[in-house]
Amino acid sequence: VVDYQGVIACVDMIGGVEVNVPFHMEYTDIYDDPPLYIDIPAGVQLLDGEEALKFLRYRKGYDNQDLGRIEAQQQFIKAAVKKALGFQLPSVIKEAYSYIETNISMSDILNLAGDLVGFSADNIETYILPGMETPLEGLSFYIPDKEGIRNLAYSLYGLNTINND
C-alpha cells in the first residue's frame, strides 16, 4: 500500500510522469482536509508528484465515470513504470521502500526486480474486472460480474471455461 505522500515522493523521485490528460481536469473540494484544488490542462503533461496525485484522484468528467478514472490510472502506472525502468531500479526501490506498507522484505523486492532486466513497460497489460456501475443512495458502487471475472481469469491463463449450468 502506498499513501498519498508516497505517491508524491515516488513520482518526484523519478522526475515526474508524462501522461496525456484527456480533458481539462478542474475540481474544488473545500471540505477535504487540506482543501483539494485540481486544475490540470488537457493534453500531454509532465506531472510532478503533487499534480500526479491530483490526476489520480480526479473522478468527475469521464464519460464512463469511475471506469474512466481506472483507465487513466492504468495509463499513469504504465508511464510511471516506463520512466522508473530508465533509472537504476535498485536505487529507486530502496528510496521508495520507506513509503510502501508491505510484508515483503526489501531483499525480496530487490530479487524480484532482478527479473525486470530487459522488461519493457510496453508489455504491461491491464484489465478492468467485468462488472457494472450501480448508483445507490447517491453513491456509486461497482458490482462485480463473477462469471465474467472467472472467464477473464481462465482466458488470461489459457484455460477452457466450464459452464456450471
PLM features: residue spans?
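Structural motif
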Residues: 1-2, 22
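Structural recognition of the beta-strand scaffold that forms the well-ordered cores
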Residues: 1, 54-55, 125-128
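Short, glycine/acidic-rich beta->alpha junctions
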Residues: 2-3, 108
